[in-house]
Amino acid sequence: MSTTPATPKVGFVSLGCPKALVDSERILTQLRMEGYEVVPTYEDADVVVVNTCGFIDSAKAESLEVIGEAIKENGKVIVTGCMGVEEGSIRDVHPSVLSVTGPQQYEQVVNAVHEVVPPRQDHNPLIDLVPPQGVKLTPRHYAYLKISEGCNHSCSFCIIPSMRGKLVSRPVGEVLSEAERLVKAGVKEILVISQDTSAYGVDVKYKTDFWNGRPVKTRMLELCEALSSLGAWVRLHYVYPYPNVDDVIPLMAAGKILPYLDIPFQHASPKVLKSMKRPAFEDRTLARIKNWREQCPELVIRSTFIVGFPGETEEDFQYLLDWLTEAQLDRVGCFQYSPVEGAPANDLGLEEVPDDIKQERWDRFMAHQQAISTARLQLRIGKEIEVLIDEVEEQGSVGRSFFDAPEIDGNVFIDGDHGFKPGDKVRCRVVDADEYDMWAEPI
């Protein structure tokens, strides 16, 4: 009497940024193509894969905690991701992990799964089809599109280049074909991500590739122009403030891509920026922001900043607050500086900022920026916006406008039952707003 072999089951935990999420999607897509079932609990899995984050100490602590939970609940754990470059640190705490690999090592992770629980030999990929767009961990109506790996910068607070390597741009034809598959599968919003989006193509000297028989340069401008032809929202993230950012503003003004720029400025004080090894042209940056908004009045700028960097004085911090007042950024995140093992900032010999002062400056920063964000959203009241519906709840619908990237920005709330479903795009009028969110009514 023959029995059908059990379907191999994998548990998966993805930690960290959207770039890591895309790595997880690639691994899961390959496993699904080989017939593995992805299960939501540790208990039901034959093996658990943990995709870690290693950017800052708190992220490493979370990664180690999750690995420990998986070992306790399942016992068979494979570790990958950014913290995987510190295999010794992981094995010191969790010596029983089965394997440890760094980021982007998709094949090694899949092979490690094979060693624990081999794929079924009778699996027929033509019966259990994986969708053309692959396995996605985001809702069906939006997706992250990773255009490159690594980074050529050497910011003193960052260890990303040591974890993910130098810039390696994906062929633009491959990127555009993936985007096309996503849109055909129902994706309404494409979020372009990388470590350094504006450097796309630098490593290959902006070589010309082909998409649907059409020549396209491997460069941010040409990529955006091509993406705009697909009919989805296109949102740019992790844009380093190179001069070529100016080139995409006309596309935003023309409505071809969303008028939204995610630019991590990190600070404004020339002295602190120099210590960070970031561009220290804060006055020129203000002029550029002014010029961008003259060309595209609807432009939304999101940024992130670090307070309490070694050597930051009260004068430096006040300079940052004054700069924020001038810049009038729309969406802003802020982190208190946390030393990262292996980061060049540890060896600068600068005076550490005490934790209580870091906290006090963070509180002041957030209060200062909240007032700016509130005032800018108040300007939207009475205006028409297009809203992409993310969720439908009992009280109404929750969506986002071009102002809002998923997870990190605000929401648009629409009260009442209007028959909407996730992925719908709805014309609305803004009726109220606070420092982060807007309330709107369908038109």
Curated annotation (Swiss-Prot):
Residues involved in [4Fe-4S] cluster 1 binding: 17, 53, 82
UniProt domain Radical SAM core: residue ranges: 137-375
Listed GO CC annotations: cytosol
Residues engaged in binding [4Fe-4S] cluster 2: 151, 155, 158
Compartment list: Cytoplasm
Details of cofactor binding: Binds 2 [4Fe-4S] clusters. One cluster is coordinated with 3 cysteines and an exchangeable S-adenosyl-L-methionine.
Domain TRAM: 378-443
GO terms (BP aspect): tRNA modification
Keyword Iron-sulfur in record: yes
Reactions listed under catalytic activity: L-aspartate(89)-[ribosomal protein uS12]-hydrogen + (sulfur carrier)-SH + AH2 + 2 S-adenosyl-L-methionine = 3-methylsulfanyl-L-aspartate(89)-[ribosomal protein uS12]-hydrogen + (sulfur carrier)-H + 5'-deoxyadenosine + L-methionine + A + S-adenosyl-L-homocysteine + 2 H(+)
Sequence intervals crossing the membrane: none
Single GO molecular function: metal ion binding
Gene3D superfamilies found in the cross-reference section: Methylthiotransferase, N-terminal domain, Nucleic acid-binding proteins, tm_1862 like domain
Pfam entry (one): TRAM_2
Domain MTTase N-terminal: 8-118
Keyword Transmembrane applies: no
Family label: Belongs to the methylthiotransferase family. RimO subfamily.
Function: Catalyzes the methylthiolation of an aspartic acid residue of ribosomal protein uS12.
Name of the protein this chain belongs to: Ribosomal protein uS12 methylthiotransferase RimO
Gene that this polypeptide is encoded by: rimO
